[in-house]
């Protein structure tokens, strides 16, 4: 809808920005022309991976689609730790919205600059936050969270993978949701072992075992 503004901040921890864009081009070619063109083919890698002139023309046609995609989806592939992702999104919040005090009065520009600089006491007057656009939906998509760089604990030791993911979800994602109204979406992969068909004692396939479950994450 025209009165809704959507931004998706896609923290791609597994694929580079280039690969995500090439994947979208591949999807475009299949959706519109039913052509299966892999990322490897788009990169013209391999002895026989040459693209015919017709497909090259169709790839150029995808430019408008890709630009529209990138207008909404901001691909970030160089920010990888929980605190770094939080700081990145906090800076986004500073640029697209405003803080108010308990009386509903917008904080001054100078007060906002003090908040951005994280000066002592700068955040004491903050009561709530609003995006400048009244219906601005901001999705923070992290794919996938088991690839997060391990965070340092308050004692200075490195957290485990589980502790890092827990800190990201329970501390930073909740803060982004509650303070700024952002929408965190965390992707977690199913282990490959759970994708194998399992059978019951009679040898019959147990299809329910293929459904995602906590023990397979």
Feature locations, PLM:
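A short acidic (Asp/Glu
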Residues: 19-25, 150-153, 195-198
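Loop/turn-to-beta-strand initiation segments
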Residues: 7, 70-73, 135-139, 179-185
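Well-ordered, non-membrane alpha-helical segments in soluble/globular domains
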Residues: 56-59, 85-91, 161-175, 203
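Residues immediately C-terminal
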Residues: 147
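Phosphate-binding/switch region of NTP-binding enzymes
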Residues: 171-217
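Flexible beta-alpha connector loops of hexameric P-loop NTPases
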Residues: 74, 152-165, 196-202
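Cytosolic-facing regulatory segments adjacent to core modules
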Residues: 2-132
